[in-house]
């Protein structure tokens, strides 16, 4: 008897807590629910049986969009944008030389204008 008294309130409150248990029917391509009043964030899209409203979440677009294939880029005709998007690569060349190479080149160009200094060793 105690078990029956505990189970009775649970069965009475269960439809109010769980919406699917109360038997709300799906509507509007199975994206909405038939309710007496729509909740916040839902919009009325249609009417269900027993004077209930078909409530659909208003933040989603439930229309079916036809699938289209993207247009390949090769079919498009060339235009100004193609000229703008064309990137030309340029490479700059640099010569790298050391100071030793520069001294040797400068001495070769001048010839032997300078003589070696005389070094005197005194003991």
Curated annotation (Swiss-Prot):
Keywords tagged on the record: Antibiotic, Antimicrobial, Cleavage on pair of basic residues, Defensin, Disulfide bond, Secreted, Signal
Residues spanning the signal sequence: 1-19
UniProt KW Transmembrane helix keyword: no
Primary localization: secreted
A GO CC term attached to the entry: extracellular region
GO biological process terms held by the UniProt record: defense response to Gram-negative bacterium; defense response to Gram-positive bacterium; innate immune response; killing of cells of another organism; negative regulation of cell adhesion; negative regulation of lipopolysaccharide-mediated signaling pathway
Pfam short name (any one): Defensin_beta_2
Cellular compartment(s): Secreted
Keyword Secreted attributed: yes
MF terms in GO: lipopolysaccharide binding
Comp. bias regions, Polar residues: 112-123
Similarity-based family: Belongs to the beta-defensin family.
Full protein name: Defensin beta 118
Lineage of the species this protein comes from: Eukaryota, Metazoa, Chordata, Craniata, Vertebrata
Recorded name of the encoding gene: DEFB118
């Amino acid at each position: 008897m105690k078990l029956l008294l505990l189970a009775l309130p649970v069965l009475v409150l269960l439809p109010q807590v769980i919406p699917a248990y109360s038997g709300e029917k799906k509507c509007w391509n199975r994206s909405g629910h038939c309710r007496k009043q729509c909740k916040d964030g839902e919009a009325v899209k249609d009417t269900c049986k027993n004077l209930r409203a078909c409530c659909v979440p208003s933040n989603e677009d439930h229309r079916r969009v036809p699938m289209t294939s993207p247009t390949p880029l090769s079919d498009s005709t060339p235009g100004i944008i193609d000229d703008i998007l064309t990137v030309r690569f340029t490479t700059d060349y640099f010569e790298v030389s050391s100071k030793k190479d520069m001294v040797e080149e400068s001495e070769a160009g001048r010839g032997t204008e300078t003589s070696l200094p005389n070094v005197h060793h005194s003991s």
